[in-house]
């Protein structure tokens, strides 16, 4: 009897008789295959086998559930090919001859083959234990380390109907979804000892070290034979043959050398060689912690990374507390140098982190951490999910970077990719065991046609283990403070949000196109993260506006802390393609405030997406080629530059002021970084004969010109100082996290927007020529007001048309539906922020006048 949980099929564990029969059949298959010889080391011994307790099945498969080895043996999609025929995506070219050339591969005599297989069979039937027992043995030390952290049990999932009564019309779908989540939690509790233990797969799979040796385990149910190869055994496939259990888990134990040293030296290259339905292939272990690409070599090599205890990086600084208002500096280590080169973790730590701190941000979000073979993918075509990118340095270098950020009081968010994976077959997960349905959906459902990548099967038990463990690994091992989950919209819908326009109709969110398995995974990972690390921050990239996306899981939501408010950046690009006269201020305010009540958003005017080649930064949209010749302060600016500098400041401030509860800026855009991002690339020859021109491998536009923002003789410096003033204004007044927000004026004729946020009053005049004297604005608090931020101040590249020391006194009488008002001067293309002050208010807030910088900066 087989039962399912949202596409996850659970077979009953096979009996001993079934096991022996399966093993006999497996051995007979290998005998008939005339396979490669895998001889056992004389000193090899088994440390006990483990079950892949719940094997992987495609949630869209209609076949009966059996053991993973029975289901996947010989399975291959019509579209798949042998390892030698696979072509790596974009910059990685498969060459099996090159890869296999350094391994001694021979066909064997029947007697030798039989002897080897008999030894393998004996190992496969001895001492089997479950993961639950393994984790129980480790629980004492782990509980000491994590301080007895517990993941709370599921709630009833009903509170979402009180939060959003419109969800009642979709109660069947939402109750079903929460029911699948609860059942999955129960199955994990029953079979794995709980979500906390389930998420420690990296302590079972991959390479694990004990006092007596190294154990290597790999889930590869489609493989017919496997061997561990590497520098340590001269890439001899006969030396270290792996044994398999009935759940597709391959294992080998390598005892320490006679002198007590590990059998695999730290820094050695390693791979797993498998005889698969697609042929013989060498793969990087799926749980590898470090991989490198030697110069001139394709593909990457896995590296056994286990430095001596005295050489391992020891964290010195505690994690900072979760900031009240989240202000994120989005960054990419490789392109963070002012020079045209790939930068390092160490240089980013020493040069960029202090800059981020000085600018006033309290969080740094780092892209492209997970290893990716194709640099120009911006880190989104991940090949090795547990390995930090070796382009930038070692794992210990990354730890040092994060530790330094913590010392500076910065939380560190990782841009994590669980929405898809690279199509690379030799250094990635694709076709890992020779089948296309191991980690991913089989057939066309497993391919993202726009991203040219593979799509995970979130209904697979082992995929859940892999991804949940991956999220925890980065929190535990590297002490990241949270994540920005990439491509969540693609995960939550089977159409992946492609060629679909979300209108806000709830039927778009809760129907047949919703991937319930994926949503349940997101609920699991958010429960895991928040249970183990209550201070962690989790941001989801969702463009659809999924209701209850940022509602706690126990209440029936998906569980994110923040949603990226992606529509705002698109709106700015749309407006920048028009004349100022065609802008509608009501359209601007609607887009900025069009978000779900009670669900926090991180807003941005532009991120890395808008800066990529083929698009333009906001600064380049505004000033175009004039940025090359007219940014020196001692040279007369063109009208285009004057307009660009003014609107650049206004766009960023109103985005922060109205758009969300958190703010994000991509590195360099704080000072209006010119041009675009173009990663080094060569010509691409497409199958249809077309050629996509490259840039001759140039790094010229794959860097950040921080020197421009620092140069006081350039107008970029004023833009950078304004951005710093914005951050300090929020740090002082906390307006982004205030529940009070009221737009009192959006005048299409005057092009004026006035709104209250927290205790501040914002006045924006978007008119291109009209300045308004004695312009009355409404306010809710009577008394005296002062200017606390003025975009027209000369320090920010403005014209100093306002007296920032002036005081403004309110008069009674309703205006713009406010109980009182006062008169201001509103120059064209300016943004001014006012704050109510007491007569005896001589605290630090008064010192912020007139520019919003910290007192020591004035």
From Swiss-Prot:
The active site is at 486 (nucleophile), 541 (proton donor). Disulfide bonds: none annotated. This is 1,4-alpha-glucan-branching enzyme 2-1, chloroplastic/amyloplastic. Residues 139-148 have a biased composition (Basic and acidic residues). Induction: Induced by light, preferentially when associated with glucose, fructose or sucrose treatment, but repressed by darkness. The gene is SBE2.1. Mostly expressed in roots, stems, seeds, inflorescences, flowers and leaves, and, to a lower extent, in seedlings. Pathway: Glycan biosynthesis; starch biosynthesis. Residues 38-125, 139-158 are annotated as: Disordered. Monomer. Pfam families: Alpha-amylase, Alpha-amylase_C, CBM_48. Keywords: Amyloplast, Chloroplast, Glycosyltransferase, Plastid, Transferase, Transit peptide. GO terms for molecular function: 1,4-alpha-glucan branching enzyme activity; cation binding; hydrolase activity, hydrolyzing O-glycosyl compounds. Catalyzes the formation of the alpha-1,6-glucosidic linkages in starch by scission of a 1,4-alpha-linked oligosaccharide from growing alpha-1,4-glucan chains and the subsequent attachment of the oligosaccharide to the alpha-1,6 position. It catalyses: Transfers a segment of a (1->4)-alpha-D-glucan chain to a primary hydroxy group in a similar glucan chain. It is found in: Plastid, Chloroplast stroma; Plastid, Amyloplast. Disruption phenotype: Modified starch composition. This phenotype is enhanced when associated with SBE2.2 and SBE3 disruptions. GO terms for cellular component: amyloplast; chloroplast; chloroplast stroma. Its EC number is 2.4.1.18. The keyword Chloroplast applies.
